[in-house]
Swiss-Prot record:
Protein's name in the database: Trigger factor
Keyword Cell cycle: yes
Protein's job: Involved in protein export. Acts as a chaperone by maintaining the newly synthesized protein in an open conformation. Functions as a peptidyl-prolyl cis-trans isomerase.
Record field: transmembrane: none
Organism from which the protein derives: Salmonella paratyphi B (strain ATCC BAA-1250 / SPB7)
Gene (UniProt): tig
Length: 432
């Protein structure tokens, strides 16, 4: 076997291989012997068919199969010998073949980039230092009560957190526009559902009032004909309702799994959940900064084949989220996923090099801790832990999570890490 390797462009490689004629003939004869043992031909017993008849009937197809097998095996031998690491599926380009002559073919593919990590010492990471305070717990309890609130009609003016029922008609330059009119529209104030200025224009008015407000559509508004346009809305305010928050009664508290129904028990449960969320948020914040720094410090070429493969993964995930099938997934425009796919491939290659250079392996104690932490959010943690322990795929996924964490920690060990006091609310809003 003769082998030559050339660089086509960037990460592209072409391996040209020549297989000696005698190697081909030896393999063909060997395969014909195997075929002769199995075939049945009228007039001959099984395994007793003369070789010349077997060759006459099956020689062409056997030769084709043998060539395909030799091309594959010789390519594998070549990349092992040349220490080449292909990325993605290779493209075989066969040359002209004549029986009794050497056979030359080429294989085109991309290789993984040679990653040499640099700049880890210059990465800056700001680690949030946060405590869950009693005030944070109070806010969360209010949120829980608001989620369970009922609405009661009131006579006064609409406030920032009230709910209103309105009719409205919008116009731009005196002309009504599509989607700018509604009847008995129920609007919960303070959720940012409407364009800027709309809710402010409703606040302070009472049921039974009709009034006009002036607003401006944002420049990034989805409707092209309305971007940045000044508009008027004629509004008929039909009903104003305010929230009635439930009291922290024993019955209410037990809805959240607090068996003794006490306020102290509810506060303890809420605090525990908030601290679990906080731990994850801090970890994610630090991780995202470390990875961002790693990417900025290491500009690497990325094999197109890996990006294409990642795009297909993202397409399928998107289709699953919205109830689509395989065919619909592959029809989604690649432009929607290209940037994210490239980013994921780059991060994977860089973290892979961190893992390789630091000789990291998944820490089983960390894996166990991650599963226990995740399971604690469920009603029966033991059942979840047992379910994971019996599922190889889930366990492998969690090992990958642990290994990624260990890689990030290896980056952080060399990075410049500082601490910054932050509130619970500020950190969680950054995560949103």
């Amino acid at each position: 076997m003769q082998v030559s390797v050339e660089t086509t462009q960037g990460l592209g490689r072409r391996v040209t291989i020549t297989i000696a004629a005698d190697s081909i003939e030896t393999a063909v004869k060997s395969e014909l012997v195997n075929v002769a043992k199995k075939v049945r031909i009228d007039g001959f017993r099984k395994g007793k068919v003369p070789m010349n008849i077997v060759a006459q009937r099956y020689g062409a197809s056997v030769r084709q199969d043998v060539l395909g097998d030799l091309m594959s095996r010789n390519f594998v031998d070549a990349i092992i010998k040349e220490k080449i690491n292909p990325a993605g599926a290779p493209n075989y380009v066969p040359g002209e073949y004549k029986v009794g002559e050497d056979f030359t073919y080429s294989v085109e593919f991309e290789v993984y980039p040679e990653v040499e990590l640099t700049g880890l010492e210059s990465i800056e990471v700001e680690k949030p230092v946060v405590e869950v305070t009693d005030a944070d717990v109070d806010v969360m309890l209010d949120t829980l009560r608001k989620q369970q609130a009922t609405w009661k009609e009131k006579d006064g003016a609409a406030d920032a957190e009230d709910r209103v029922t309105i009719d409205f008609t919008g116009s731009v330059d005196g002309e009504e526009f599509e989607g700018g009119k509604a009847t008995d529209f129920v609007l919960a104030m303070g959720q940012g559902r409407m364009i800027p200025g709309f809710e402010d224009g409703v606040k302070g008015h009472k049921a039974g009032e009709e009034f006009t407000i002036d607003v401006t559509f944002p420049e990034e508004y989805h409707a092209e004909n309305l971007k940045g346009k000044a508009a008027k809305f004629v509004i008929n305010l039909k009903k104003v309702e305010e929230r009635e928050l439930p009291e922290l009664t024993e019955e209410f508290i037990k809805r959240f799994g607090v068996e003794d129904g006490s306020v102290a028990g509810l506060r303890a449960e809420v605090r525990k959940n908030m601290e679990r969320e906080l731990k994850g948020a801090v970890r994610n914040r630090v991780k995202s900064q470390a990875i961002e720094g790693l990417v900025k410090a290491n500009d690497i070429d990325v094999p197109a084949a890996l990006i294409d493969s990642e795009i297909d993964v993202l397409r399928r995930q998107a289709a699953q989220r919205f109830g689509g099938n395989e065919k619909q997934a592959l029809e989604l425009p690649r432009e929607l996923f290209e940037e994210q796919a490239k980013r994921r491939v780059v991060v994977g290659l860089l973290l892979g090099e961190v893992i390789r250079t630091n000789e990291l392996k998944a820490d089983e104690e960390r894996v166990k801790g991650l599963i226990e932490e995740m399971a604690s959010a469920y009603e029966d943690p033991k059942e979840v832990i047992e379910f994971y322990s019996k599922n190889k795929e889930l366990m492998d996924n969690m090992r990958n999570v642990a290994l990624e964490e260990q890689a990030v920690e290896a980056v952080l060990a060399k990075a410049k890490v500082s601490e910054k006091a932050t509130s619970f609310n500020e950190l969680m809003n950054q995560q949103a």
